[in-house]
């Protein structure tokens, strides 16, 4: 039972955790709430409603969610009218735990139920029980809702939701449901609208974006990319995230042929061991993954490839770990998201495999992966010194107002003296320095 509110809350603030899809969802939630008269707050302390758009992919994201919730518990003790809601993936598959561990949370809402959020908040004054909106909607894509975007240069655009792959370690099919795609014409119309609004770059999003389909038009993701590229030839186009088994030669040919499709592919491998990949239910072997890398580079020699890596998955041996390290060297990733394995409730691995790699071993293997990737990244970035590259300026550098930060088509971050340039400008920069994470240079 919850305490009834004496007044209607009017302002809100959103904490966003996790992936780009969650960032896009927070922009959709902002639009839906604003349409019903709620006002975004610039900071949490002045908001009547604090929403936490949660991520369940890894344990550390849930830990950060818990830390902020405990901070809000103290604030709610001082201000009982504060409304706290948890959105997204965590409540979708751990409803009872959210309510039991955090009894001060007023409501929870899953990723398919954001259209009902404003009505839920409006009804809180009369609610006795804590509302939970967690129904799956296999048709919901939020198409037609114009997000309130956080930036004005680069935009995220979800083109599909959900995932049908059921990898052993992954909660996404549980939290996001089955795959469904936004239609071709709707995607193109939204990208054209972004261009007219002044955006210079768009990233097409999906948990498994290469599975996008428009059955009525007989189009796959290669057809979508080509259509979007032709519709907005002056915009940079990116996409994420891809599954290795779905990277087709036709798709790579489109990227190679269209100048505004960025030469960057994020292709999560998770492990370099075929035994591990089989246990993870990834649907490909080490050799098949390397064949796809070779195919990509045969069409796009200058492509930047990035990845995700998991250290210490169930039953992983030292031999399996060494195969991951050797694959990293063979591919030469620009960068990687690197984590040690944490059990996710509701996954196939949680039900069927022992989490038998000691934490000390997981952390040691992860550190080896990080150190190797840093060395590979440093070598790749140092090879850029002396080259002149195209950069889309995105913002002032955190180091100095006299510097700008931008990215190359390969998604490499470049910091340079701003001179006469401003954010949203596209310019040429001669690279003069490099670390394992950043390039630096001078505008040409």
UniProtKB/Swiss-Prot annotation:
Cofactor detail note:
Binds 2 [4Fe-4S] clusters. One cluster is coordinated with 3 cysteines and an exchangeable S-adenosyl-L-methionine.
Question: Which superkingdom does the taxonomy of this entry point to?
Answer: Bacteria
Q: Which UniProt keywords apply?
A: 4Fe-4S, Cytoplasm, Iron, Iron-sulfur, Metal-binding, S-adenosyl-L-methionine, Transferase, tRNA processing
Q: Which positions are annotated as binding [4Fe-4S] cluster 2? A: 163, 167, 170
Q: What InterPro entries is this protein classified in?
A: Elp3/MiaA/NifB-like_rSAM, Methylthiotransferase, Methylthiotransferase_CS, Methylthiotransferase_N, Methylthiotransferase_N_sf, MiaB_methiolase, rSAM, rSAM_horseshoe
According to its UniProt record, this protein's enzyme class is transferase
Q: How does it assemble?
A: Monomer.
The name this protein goes by in its record: tRNA-2-methylthio-N(6)-dimethylallyladenosine synthase
Organism listed in the record:
Chlorobaculum tepidum (strain ATCC 49652 / DSM 12025 / NBRC 103806 / TLS) (Chlorobium tepidum)
Source organism phylogeny: Bacteria, Pseudomonadati, Chlorobiota, Chlorobiia, Chlorobiales
Recorded name of the encoding gene: miaB
């Amino acid at each position: 039972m919850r305490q009834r509110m004496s007044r209607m809350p009017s302002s809100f603030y959103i904490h966003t955790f996790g992936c780009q899809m969650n960032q896009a969802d927070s922009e959709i939630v902002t639009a839906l709430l604003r349409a019903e008269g709620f006002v975004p707050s610039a900071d949490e302390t002045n908001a009547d409603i604090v929403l936490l758009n949660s991520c369940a992919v890894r344990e550390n994201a849930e830990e950060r969610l818990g830390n902020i919730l405990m901070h809000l518990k103290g604030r709610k003790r001082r201000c009982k009218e504060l409304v706290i809601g948890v959105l997204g993936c965590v409540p979708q598959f751990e409803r009872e735990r959210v309510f039991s561990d955090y009894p001060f949370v007023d409501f929870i809402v899953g990723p398919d139920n954001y259209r009902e959020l404003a009505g839920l908040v409006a009804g809180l004054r009369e609610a006795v029980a804590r509302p939970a909106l967690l129904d799956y909607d296999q048709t919901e894509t939020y198409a037609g809702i114009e997000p309130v975007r956080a930036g004005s240069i680069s935009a995220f655009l979800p083109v599909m939701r959900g995932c049908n792959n059921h990898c052993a370690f992954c909660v996404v099919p549980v939290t996001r449901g089955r795959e469904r795609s936004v239609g071709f014409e709707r995607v193109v119309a939204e990208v054209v609208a972004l261009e007219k609004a002044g955006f210079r770059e768009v990233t097409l999003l999906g948990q498994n974006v290469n599975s996008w389909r428009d059955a009525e038009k007989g189009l796959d993701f290669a057809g979508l990319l080509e259509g979007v590229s032709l519709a907005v030839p002056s915009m940079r186009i990116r996409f994420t995230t891809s599954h290795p088994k779905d990277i087709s030669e036709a798709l790579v040919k489109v990227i190679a042929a269209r100048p505004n499709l960025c030469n960057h592919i994020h292709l999560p491998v998770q492990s370099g061991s075929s035994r591990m990949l089989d246990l993870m239910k990834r649907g490909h072997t080490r050799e098949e993954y390397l064949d796809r890398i070779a195919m990509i580079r045969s069409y796009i020699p200058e492509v930047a490839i990035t990845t995700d890596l998991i250290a210490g998955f169930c039953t992983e041996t030292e031999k399996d770990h060494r195969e991951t390290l050797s694959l990293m060297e063979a591919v030469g990733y620009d960068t990687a998201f690197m984590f040690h394995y944490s059990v996710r409730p509701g996954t196939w691995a949680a039900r069927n495999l022992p989490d038998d790699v000691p934490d000390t071993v997981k952390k040691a293997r992860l550190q080896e992966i990080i150190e190797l990737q840093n060395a590979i990244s440093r070598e790749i970035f140092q090879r850029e010194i002396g080259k002149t590259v195209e950069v889309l300026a995105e913002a002032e550098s955190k180091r100095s107002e006299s510097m700008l930060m931008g990215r190359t088509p390969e998604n490499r971050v470049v910091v340079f003296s701003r001179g006469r340039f401003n954010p949203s400008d596209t310019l040429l920069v001669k690279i003069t320095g490099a670390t394992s994470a950043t390039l630096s240079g001078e505008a040409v």
